[in-house]
């Protein structure tokens, strides 16, 4: 199994998306719901700091500052739980590698880093297993850039890097292998806006409001078990 360990520390990348939380080995929706007692209808609850949390049942709404509430912290703990379970690790020192939209990183980088580092020790329980994680460091990078940083030498002339997520689209101009900082943009244009437009078109044409999950599945797979009059509009 592929491990990411450097000087005895687990390197854990977490993409804190508006639609989904992504790690090396796990992906789940970014919604989170807290309960005072263990939920009866799920076996996938995270227990942390005296509460139970169910994640992954829905997407989180768009926010311009990911440190403005507790959700992304809980989602980070959930990401650690799922990723460490996959790696068969229950106790470790960890370095988190995370991202922010390219146009926000200058203003929000330090605040987001402090937000994720506020507790050095994190204890939680997941699937009946106790975990203990010591956060050694958090490193914040521009979203999307990590995907090409090792191949910048291949980018001759003018190139545009586009990272299209659920809530935002990040674009970066790369000239002869060098990112141009003045030509980096973050727009509130992502998959969610496509789904909203799709749903609005269906409502206007048929008077039927298609559920969000059905529209999302159609975008993912290109088909749905629906009448042609609906799928033709969705296309």
Task: Please identify what each model-predicted range represents.
Residues 1-161, 178-193, 205, 212-235:
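Nucleotide/phosphate-binding catalytic cleft detector across ATP-hydrolyzing
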Residues 171-176:
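PRPP/pyrophosphate-binding module of the type I phosphoribosyltransferase fold
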Residues 164-170:
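Ser/Thr-glycine-rich phosphate-binding loops at phosphate-binding pockets of nucleotides
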Residues 196, 200-204:
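Long, charge-rich alpha-helical interaction segments
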């Amino acid at each position: 199994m592929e491990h990411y360990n450097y000087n005895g520390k687990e390197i854990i990348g977490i993409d804190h998306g508006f639609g989904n939380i992504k790690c090396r080995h796990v992906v789940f929706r970014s919604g989170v719901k807290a309960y005072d007692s263990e939920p009866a209808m799920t076996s996938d609850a995270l227990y942390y700091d005296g509460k139970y949390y169910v994640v992954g049942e829905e997407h989180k709404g768009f926010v311009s500052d990911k440190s403005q509430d507790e959700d992304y912290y809980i989602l980070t703990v959930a990401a650690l739980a799922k990723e460490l379970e996959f790696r068969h690790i229950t106790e470790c020192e960890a370095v988190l590698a995370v991202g922010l939209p390219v146009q926000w990183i200058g203003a929000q980088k330090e605040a987001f880093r402090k937000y994720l580092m506020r507790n050095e020790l994190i204890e939680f329980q997941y699937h009946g297993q106790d975990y203990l994680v010591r956060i050694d460091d958090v490193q914040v990078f521009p979203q999307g850039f990590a995907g090409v940083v090792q191949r910048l030498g291949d980018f001759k002339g003018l190139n545009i890097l586009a990272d299209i997520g659920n809530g935002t689209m990040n674009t970066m101009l790369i000239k002869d292998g060098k990112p141009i900082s003045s030509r980096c943009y973050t727009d509130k244009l992502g998959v969610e806006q496509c789904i909203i437009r799709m749903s609005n078109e269906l409502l206007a044409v048929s008077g039927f409001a298609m559920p969000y999950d059905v529209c999302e599945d159609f975008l993912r797979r290109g088909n749905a078990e629906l009448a042609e009059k609906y799928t033709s509009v969705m296309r």
